Each structure stands twice: as C-alpha cells, then as structure tokens.
C-alpha cells in the first residue's frame, strides 16, 4: 500500500524517472502555520548530489504545496505536495530490461504485478521517500508545536567502522540527551557526531566506491520531550509502529530499540529502569533508560532511541554474474548514478517516518483523552 497512518495519514506517489514525486497528507489540524520553507530544509538534507559520497544525480527537490493551505495556514483539508524529477536518464537502465538486479526489487515487482517500471526502481526507488520526508516535515512541526518534541538521527556505523552506541554507557546516554541536527550536519556529509571515526567512515565509503561497489551502515535516532501515554496495548505498541515505519524504508534490514539485542545478556536486576520522583517536573522519571522510552508499548516520557541497519546498495557498477528474466546466464554491470552508501542520506528519512508515527499516535491519544473527558 502507498498510504501510512490512521489519523495523520500520508499517501506517496511517483517513480524514479516519472515527471514528479510527492504526497498527499490528510489529518493535519487546521490553523497551523505552514509554507514551503517549513518543508524544504529536510528535503535539501535528503537530496542527491550533496557530496562525492552520494549519487551525482542532480535534483533540486524543490517542494510545491498544491492544496490544503491558504495565506500560510493549514485548512484542515488534504495537503498535496509535488516535487519535480528534473534529472532523468531512463536510458541508463536499458540493460535492466533483460536482467533483474541482484537483491533489488526488479524480480519481485515483476512477479507481483506482471510488469515493472523500465527505468530505475519504480516505486522501490529511494525517490519515493521524497514524499515521506515532505510529509514528515509537517508532522515534525505539529509535534514541536504541541509538545516541543525533538527528533535527531545520525550515523553510528559504516561497514566495520562504528562509533560507541552502548546503551549502558553514560557517555552514549549523554549524547542522546544533547545531540542536535546542527551538530550532526556540522560533521559533513557522513553525519556521524563522533569526529574520531567520521573520517574513517568517509574512507570506508570511498574504498567501496573506488571498487565500483557499495557498503551499508546503521542510523541511530533519538526522540526527546515526547509525552507519556502514546502507543496502544498489544498490536499497535509504539515500538511496533516505529519498527513498521523503519522497515518500510528502502534498504532497511532491521530495528532495535533501547538496549535491543545487547539487553539479552544483562540480568533483570541490571536491566530494569528504577523510578524516582522529579520535583522540577512533578512526575515519575526513570534513573536509567534501557527500555528506550517505551514500556508495555506505551511511551513513558523518557528519550526514545533506536537503531536501523541499512544494507549495501543493490545497484552497483561492478560486474556480477547473474541471469536474465528468461534464465540465461550473463554479466550485469549496472549503469546509472547510485549511492555507494545510502546511510548518510537516510537520516532525514528516518526522522520523517519517526515523526509520522508519533504525530499519528499523538492524535490518537488526544482523541482518547477527549472521549474520556466526555464520559467523566
């Protein structure tokens, strides 16, 4: 499906080499200030051609709001946004009419629909995520205005090069409390806040690019100032919805929240997060945050933090022995312009999908609070 969310809903449209990509966002409350200037910064962070570490495809990715606002205010009606595809080269994909790319969606899309886009990855292309980022920027503004929510993602691993993300380490927890987007972006195109490994990550990507290959990595994201009570019991737990959102991003291959897989080797006596009463905020807090801000599927007011691994980009120009759709063995060396590592550009996409989940959860909780007030 191309629609995500229940009350705060987004439908994305477009393929890699069609005339435009974009989205329709429904459920945005009326009266909220909104212009293209609120959306463009995140699209600019996502756009290709930012450095030698990304694809050279030259897209400006300028957003145009088509409906749902008037005089800079939302009307409460669906908001349509369009971004033109300006640097199309469909001829780069002529060989892929015969060969499904290894580990790409060419084969599975063809099997599912009986047809596939002849240029690029179609809906499986990362160009589809432009609509996510545009709608996520609206969700972020809604969250910031309602609860001062902050969402910051950053790169913690490229290939074998990794920074510390030990959830039991006070230094890492301090980083989660203080990291900002300005700090992340100040580290250059790699977007890793640890200067001691950022340069090594750049060299790692350059090494694989030089070999006409690609490499994967990990994005970590933190959410601060989220209210308590968001998320549903059982099937729509907050971490389940976040996992759903993250695993819908192209090239993502997993999800872990809080202590994640690291927590399985820690006894409950050390893993539990004891409570204390904080007078300044007049509420219960936890002394540690191994739960990652979610207990029983519901936000507890602490930082939510999670990590998402992204696989090596499937489309590479290195020769690969593979087979055509007809089963004939052959050699594929993909043409086109592709990222040697998608992880740094995934940052605003992870932030956007996080914002969409949380905006939806906040609206659902507000509806529940209203119904409870009516009953009582």
UniProtKB/Swiss-Prot annotation:
GO BP terms: amino acid biosynthetic process; aromatic amino acid family biosynthetic process; chorismate biosynthetic process
Organism superkingdom: Eukaryota
CDD domains from the UniProt entry: Chorismate_synthase
Catalytic activity: 5-O-(1-carboxyvinyl)-3-phosphoshikimate = chorismate + phosphate; FMNH2 + NADP(+) = FMN + NADPH + 2 H(+)
GO molecular function, one term: riboflavin reductase (NADPH) activity
Family, as annotated: Belongs to the chorismate synthase family.
HAMAP family: Chorismate_synth
Function: Bifunctional chorismate synthase and flavin reductase that catalyzes the conversion of 5-enolpyruvylshikimate 3-phosphate (EPSP) to form chorismate, which is the last common intermediate in the synthesis of the three aromatic amino acids phenylalanine, tyrosine and tryptophan. Also acts as a flavin reductase (FR) able to generate reduced flavin mononucleotide in the presence of NADPH.
Name by which UniProt lists this protein: Chorismate synthase ARO2
